[in-house]
Amino acid sequence: MKSESESHAQSQIDSLMAVIPAAGSGSRMQANIPKQFLMVANRTLLEYSIEAVLKDARVEQVFVAVSDSNAEYLIELKKSLPTKVHFVTGGNSRAESVLAGVKVAVSQGATHVLVHDAARPCLPKKALTAVINTGLKDPQGAILAIPVRDSLKRAVISVNDETGVTHIESSVDREALWQAQTPQVFNAERLQQAIEHMGALNPQLTDEASAMQWCGFQPALIPGSIRNLKVTHPEDFECVRDWLLADNNDHKN
């Protein structure tokens, strides 16, 4: 077991920086603006997500990967953000945007990176602290995730069904199945190499843990939260909007 002095020395060595991929269009939201720029109480979801990540003082800098097409949304946004938040040019895919941010973080001296979704604004501080604690000390990294609770069904894949109704092929055993969330925390250079090795355009690269798994790592699963919901569909936005408004009211009272 490490002594207190050894643990303190290790914390001095570690340099944690965050990467938030925010270059996506969010087409499934059926909104006229990218989902990360949807507003709740005069603030964007991206601002809430950045604020959530910065609740842990160990996060030294935040690199937000954005698209040039989002320039109009960034003009005012840049004025309201802390100086430790920086924008970098993202790519056409999530993985390309993450890779761009990780490369900048590494160039700035990051030993570890924390990757968080731009449209996951209700991250609890307790969960953030837990995943950072494990991610910094576990060489395989760590991610937030929640055990799958509902029954899972595999659908029959048929292109000849004229009714358009999808039918069940079989049930899937949910034992040992977890639903991945973010943040995901890894050694910075190791994650960069993993994404480059797997290929940023590989369709199987759905999150950072996928790249690490591709290279033989088994990241730790840290219990997340149902509130740590990613806005993907309109009903998701309704949920996080209500939570954020409730939190804002609590802070005012």
UniProtKB/Swiss-Prot annotation:
Biological process according to GO: isopentenyl diphosphate biosynthetic process, methylerythritol 4-phosphate pathway
Xref: Pfam families: IspD
Site feature (Positions MEP for the nucleophilic attack) residues: 174, 230
SUPFAM superfamilies: Nucleotide-diphospho-sugar transferases (SSF53448)
Gene name of the record: ispD
Keywords: Isoprene biosynthesis, Nucleotidyltransferase, Transferase
Pathway where it operates: Isoprenoid biosynthesis; isopentenyl diphosphate biosynthesis via DXP pathway; isopentenyl diphosphate from 1-deoxy-D-xylulose 5-phosphate: step 2/6
Name of the protein in question: 2-C-methyl-D-erythritol 4-phosphate cytidylyltransferase
Organism per entry: Idiomarina loihiensis (strain ATCC BAA-735 / DSM 15497 / L2-TR)
Any one Gene Ontology molecular-function term assigned to this protein's record: 2-C-methyl-D-erythritol 4-phosphate cytidylyltransferase activity
Disulfide feature: none
Cross-referenced InterPro entries: IspD, IspD/TarI, IspD/TarI_cytidylyltransf_bact, ISPD_synthase_CS, Nucleotide-diphossugar_trans
Family: Belongs to the IspD/TarI cytidylyltransferase family. IspD subfamily.
Top-rank taxon, per record: Bacteria
E.C. number: 2.7.7.60
NCBIfam families, sorted: ispD
Enzyme class: transferase
Signal peptide: none
Free-text function comment from the UniProt entry: Catalyzes the formation of 4-diphosphocytidyl-2-C-methyl-D-erythritol from CTP and 2-C-methyl-D-erythritol 4-phosphate (MEP).
